[in-house]
A protein has these predicted regions:
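Asparagine-centered strand-capping/turn motif at beta-strand->loop junctions
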Residues: 15-20
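Short acidic/proline- and small/hydrophobic-mixed sequence motifs that coincide with surface turns
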Residues: 21-25, 40, 70
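Transition segment at domain starts
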Residues: 1-8, 62
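Terminal connector regions
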Residues: 42, 59-81
Length: 81
């Protein structure tokens, strides 16, 4: 997890389409937590039109007021949409 130039918390990564389906759309959901384990917020990113065997980058951004309290995150869902 990093912070962008606005101080928003950013989770970056990549996913790969391991199926033979073309133009797969995927949703990545991340939950952001405080040091005490309190859920601060949930955000999503969508990777669109991912062809067979192709890799796509994602960036899940939390820009809420409590962004400075975030200490860790969990990717809680990765699904085709």
């Amino acid at each position: 997890m990093s912070a962008n130039r606005f101080g928003h918390r950013v989770v970056e990564g990549a996913i790969r389409n391991i199926s033979s389906d073309s133009n797969v759309n995927a949703e990545i959901k991340a939950e952001y937590y405080s040091a005490t384990g309190t859920l601060i917020g949930t955000e999503v990113d969508i990777v669109r039109r991912l062809g067979p065997g192709k890799t796509g980058a994602f960036e899940v951004v939390y820009s809420g007021e409590q962004r400075w309290d975030i200490k860790y995150y969990k990717i809680v869902n990765l699904q085709e949409i």
